[in-house]
Regions:
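Short aromatic-enriched loop/helix-cap "lid" or pocket-rim segments at secondary-structure transitions
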Residues: 43, 73-75, 120-123, 170-172, ...
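Active-site donor-binding loop signature of nucleotide-sugar glycosyltransferases
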Residues: 97, 113, 128, 217-219
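Core catalytic region of metal-dependent phosphoesterases/phosphodiesterases
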Residues: 5, 10-103, 174, 181-185, ...
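Active-site-proximal loop/helix segment associated with metal-binding centers of metalloenzymes
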Residues: 90, 104-176
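Beta-strand-turn-beta hairpins that frame and shape the catalytic cleft
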Residues: 1-3, 99-110, 157, 209-213
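Proline-aspartate-enriched helix->loop->beta-strand connector
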Residues: 155, 159-160, 193-194, 198-199
Length: 260
């Protein structure tokens, strides 16, 4: 079973949704960007991340634009379910840009990152360095198309922060603003076969028939396939090492000096 929700901005009250009570071990909640729970590196924040990582289901997110990329990039990268992820804590992971996964028996193409609406207001060189990290690199764009092509340009679900350019007019009527990520996702739209595309950023919940969903604070079931109940993996106890008994000292005959 896979559920999807939108921008969190560090607000974990979304996890109280009754929908999530249906999720089992091996299922997943996917967040479409602006996770925002990796922000200042405080002890409280680390406790929150540990708590989310202890959920029985997988908590997965693509990055948006309101993230602390310096902190996020410190987490280790590892292969998981077919694609690269950043392991945050336990069952909490970042799905990386342009990666392809098999999650809860469904295929998912993920593409996080975007262009902040505040970019034009940055004045300091350091600010520019920060927002550049929001943007996908040419290598990530190319890798995304290559990964899709490797899987016959087919996925059950596409998860992105930005919408494809063609969807913007259905969300913001009269808006002509586009960026190169929107245009790139249009290319994905033209080549990929998929069941549903979820994206965030716009802070509204809106279905664009037949296969596109702009999502914000709703928690929706993308796939309700019930996986068999999985047993919690048992912690392996370290094997006890048997202590060797010391050899018994032999007595010597006082007269001969020989050992008895």
């Amino acid at each position: 079973m896979i559920c999807v929700t939108g921008d969190l901005h560090g607000d974990i009250s979304r996890f109280k949704s009754p929908v999530l009570k249906k999720l089992r071990r091996g299922d997943a909640l996917i967040i479409t960007g602006d996770f925002g729970c990796i922000w200042n590196g405080s002890k409280k924040e680390k406790r929150t991340l540990k708590k989310l990582g202890k959920k029985k289901y997988n908590v997965l997110f693509v990055e948006g634009v309101h993230e602390n990329f310096d902190l996020l990039n410190e987490y280790p990268v590892e292969q998981w379910c077919g694609g690269k992820t950043r392991l945050i804590s336990g069952n909490l992971r970042q799905l990386m840009r342009g990666q392809y996964y098999t999650i809860a028996e469904k295929t998912v193409f993920a593409f996080g990152g975007g262009q902040s609406e505040e970019n034009n207001s940055y004045l300091e060189p350091d600010d520019e360095k920060n927002w550049i990290k929001e943007l996908p690199t040419d290598e990530e764009l190319a890798e995304g198309l290559a990964n899709l092509a490797e899987h016959d340009n087919t996925a059950d679900f596409i998860i992105s922060y930005e919408p494809p350019a063609r969807m913007i007019e259905f969300i913001d009527i009269g808006t002509t603003s586009r960026n190169h990520i929107n245009t790139y996702l249009d290319k994905v739209l033209d080549t990929a076969k998929f069941k549903m595309w979820f994206f965030g950023k716009r802070h509204i919940n809106k279905l664009i028939p037949p296969r596109y969903r702009c999502i914000f604070d709703a928690v929706e079931v993308a796939d309700d396939t019930r996986l068999p109940k999985q047993k919690k993996p048992k912690k392996q106890k370290p094997e006890k090492v048997k202590k060797e008994k010391p050899e018994k000292k032999t007595k010597k005959d006082k007269k001969t000096g020989e050992e008895e």
